[in-house]
Each structure stands twice: as structure tokens, then as C-alpha cells.
Amino acid sequence: MRKKIILICEHCLNRNYTTTRSKLETTRLVLNKYCSSCNQKTVHKESH
């Protein structure tokens, strides 16, 4: 079963992306993605 997650920009805390991942995975997802509010690539972390 897959779990829906939301990725949040670390700088402006804007919720920019949604994705899915396995429920068996225990580590939080951290990706470098483009933020339209910051107008640059920033670190996006998984929200709870």
C-alpha cells in the first residue's frame, strides 16, 4: 500500500508538491525541488 505525502519548502513553508511512497519506508523524504514562491531550487521535506 502506498501513502500520499506532501512536500513543504524549507524556506517559505509553502506546500508545493504531492507524491506517494511506500508505508514501509521509515525515513522522511527530503528532495531538492523548485519553489515558485522562492523562485529557486530549495530543499523540500515531507510533512506529517
Curated annotation (Swiss-Prot):
> Which InterPro entries does the UniProt record give?
Ribosomal_bL33 (IPR001705), Ribosomal_bL33_CS (IPR018264), Ribosomal_bL33_sf (IPR038584), Ribosomal_zn-bd (IPR011332)
Q: Which top-rank group of organisms is this from?
A: Bacteria
The keyword Iron-sulfur is annotated on this UniProt entry: no
Which keywords label this protein? Ribonucleoprotein, Ribosomal protein
**In its keyword annotation, does this UniProt entry include Ribonucleoprotein?**
yes
GO CC, one annotated term: cytoplasm
Q: Which NCBIfam families match?
A: PRK00504.1 (NF001764), rpmG_bact (TIGR01023)
Name of the molecule in the record: Large ribosomal subunit protein bL33B
- Which species does the entry assign this protein to? Mycoplasmoides gallisepticum (strain R(low / passage 15 / clone 2))
Q: Supply the gene name.
A: rpmG 2
